[in-house]
Amino acid sequence: MKKMFVALCMAVALAGLSSCKTAQSAASTLEALDGEWKITTVEGQAITPKPGEAEAIIGFNVKEKRVYGNSGCNRLTSALQADAKKGTFTFGAAASTRMMCPDMDTEQKVLTAMGKVTGYEITKDGKLVFKAEDGKAVMTLEKK
């Protein structure tokens, strides 16, 4: 009986420790988002600033649970809505400036793609990939 009790206690302790590791790795994944990321592709097409456009970026402040960035013309900000454990991510209602730029092509592509994002993955080579509900890459970003 005593051996069974000790074995049960060890099993409970081991289960508790493994859940701590999961929580830590989830937090680590979210922390990996922290900072600014340059948008390199949208829907498989390379994104390069055209004359009059700013560099398209998305930044994360994980501590403040905030997303900010520039979609090529306008600045934007939103709440960070992510679950690192599940790899889910959505952009909340975003506030944006309303400037008109000579070419709004990048702006349109970025904002349309942002509306499709439901998940994310950080690849082995350090790229951030936003994914749509079907699992396909919507945007690829590189850490600045």
Functional labels for PLM-detected ranges:
Residues 9, 17-144:
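Lipid interaction determinants
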